[in-house]
Regions:
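Acidic/histidine metal-binding catalytic segments
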Residues: 1
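Hydrophobic helix-and-loop "lid/oligomerization" segment in the mid-to-C-terminal part
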Residues: 4, 9-138, 143-179
Length: 179
């Protein structure tokens, strides 16, 4: 069950380009052991507390789009997170909703964590825009080409302003309509 769940989540439910024939072969072998793929999927994706769904709705209402750069971002302050009884994991996957918007190739979520006095940043892309390099160059973070993370010790507003200012250095690769 755990292996299936890990492969399913890491491949975006098998939609990411990194999903290969071998991925499906491994999954086929796991299914032969009698695990229920629908039970695992339901446990992970259809098992949200009501506050998490409310947080998702709120976060999506705050999405900002930078149309000329095919970029969007969401910011959530600690106060906003607390309003929805935030628990670790509640924001998992929210950043991916930005990539479902037509022509968006770069999506970011900024989350204030006042306990650690940092801003947690999750970056996602589709196509040829390398968020690993962006994350590394701008915030000292890392990950891989289409998914990365970072931490900022600046305030939420200063982190977002730094991000927005940094986008100008990536204008050409972001403006490209090639996704």
């Amino acid at each position: 069950r755990s292996l299936y769940a890990g492969i399913m989540t890491d491949t975006g439910s098998f939609k990411f380009p990194s999903t290969t024939e071998l991925t499906h072969l491994v999954i086929s072998n796991l299914l032969k052991t009698g695990i229920s793929h629908s039970d695992i999927h339901n446990h992970i994706y259809d098992n949200n507390k009501f506050e998490r769904v409310q947080l998702l709705s709120f976060a999506l209402s705050k999405i900002k789009i930078i149309e000329n750069l095919n970029t969007c971002y969401i910011s959530l302050s600690q106060k906003e997170l607390n309003k929805f009884n935030y628990e670790k994991g509640d924001t998992e996957g929210i950043v991916n909703y930005g990539l479902s918007i037509k022509n968006i190739k770069f999506a970011v979520i900024f989350m204030e964590n006042s306990n650690d006095n940092v801003i947690r940043i999750s970056l996602r892309s589709r196509g040829d825009f390398d968020v690993n390099q962006f994350s590394k160059n701008i915030f000292g973070g890392g990950g891989h080409k289409n998914a990365a993370g970072a931490i900022s010790k600046k305030s939420l507003d200063n982190t977002i302003n730094y991000f927005l200012d940094s986008l100008k250095n990536y204008k050409e690769s972001l403006k490209s309509k090639h996704i």
